[in-house]
């Protein structure tokens, strides 16, 4: 009996010594979302993988994963603060050379860029006297797109604007877009006469202009707020949703569009000119969604800087949709100056006013 106890104690001391030497260097962790981008409230999966590359079984491994604030995990009543990360705790028994994969269903209710930043693992010694802690860092992200605004009030407004600028293009003739020539009837203005073609034909010929050119618009999103104007969080978020809604409307009408904004995209040190080239199609639209999802309400320029950007990058768009949280003297002046400077129709859309109109319509 004494020999058995000595052997048992010796064996326990050896296991305790080995467990104390375990510093988790053989434990690898990876956590990834199954989608790069989602709609607000859309369910996606978070896949966590734990791999033990060592030759020792770890009977007790407590894992605290760092998830973004606002994350809702299906089946778990978590009231997480939108602004703070929260810890999702689980306990594992992991054998040597074993990989454990766990999948959870989750969703995020608000637009933004969310990070899965790693985990903290805690393991105990063999006798359960001590705990060891190690932090594993990573940075996987998921982008939540701005919400699509499906209000009839907004759709009617966009339809009216579309009808307006699509008709206006017929009022001005572009001398570059000549599709063909025809005989002069006497009703055409003198500037329509092609003297070169007339000389070839020995009678007057006039130019016919091509009006089937692609329409193009600029979505100009201004999120600049002076510190004295307050936060206006709801109105700012509404601007992002308006930009997404306009882009989707233009996709349906097969109108090329681009986005210009003074908002920071992603990290505060990353200034973006957004989707600054006009285009359309699924790839262009998806790029715009990710841009809007990552954008913050922090700005790199004032209203005046935004005006300079638009004038510099103007390329003959038929219309400019100017989006801002609310109207003020500075913004009204910007709209007037753009209207006078550029050969485009400028449509101001102020979130505060539209929110009021939507509520009244409902």
Residue ranges and their predicted role:
Residues 186-362:
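Exposed, interaction-prone extracellular/peripheral surfaces
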